[in-house]
Amino acid sequence: IYSDIDLSNEFPPLKEVNKTIRKLSLAGYSPLKFVRIDKKEEYARRYDKAVGGGKGVFRQVDREESLIHLMRVNLLKRMESSIHSFTLTVSKLLNQVESLLSKIDDHDSDLIDALNIEELQDIELESTELEQFMIGNKTKVLLQDMDLIRFKQELEADKIFLSSIVEAAKGVTAQRDAKLELLKQTIAAKVRNPLNPDNKKVIVFTAFADTAQYLYSHIAQWASLELGIHSALITGGGTNKTTLSGLGIDLNNILTTFSPVS
């Protein structure tokens, strides 16, 4: 079932949003891309991996580039799932960008002696004392080894793009959520006109737990008041819920109650 995103038609067209997403550099996820030329070999020796018995090299910088492509696709999947999930993700990305920009502005290389990435042990890379002087999660890069001007420029560009997306997405409240409204209409039609006598069961599958939680929070009470039916939320994260009092949150209990035959 195809659905628009915004009942008010104020959210940008999907093509426009997709173009904006494709413009994102997501620089924070590719720190090796911004390592200075005179330092690239040091990082290659630390992070690149030999493959095929030494016949080839799996470059970490290529892995980061692939990750960025996957993240762009994931953003579109999040938007396809629900505007709520999409808003959470782009807001998180925006916060990460702002945090990195603050770290760059606060960076002072004079506070510490020059470091060499090859001489640092893994345990040192996780040190809280060094955290302010580097970025990255699994792949650590020292700020002193980066082209911070170019890195900051790409982060600032991402901040502009992400800010515009977040502002538009936050405007699509549950009251304006076209997909949520269509789902309610579909559920109501199924309950009021069941294919089989007295079969009012409706199962909604989603790939993302936060979408499931969002749907439950806006459908459960409505379904009870408008349709006289109970609802349950089942996720893999242990956040199960149901409108049936006294049932608890045990997965098997909920499934048995809502579908005793199966």
Regions from the language model: what does each represent?
Residues 262:
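Donor nucleotide-activated moiety binding/catalytic core segment of transferases
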Residues 1-241, 245-259:
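Helicase motor interdomain insertion/brace
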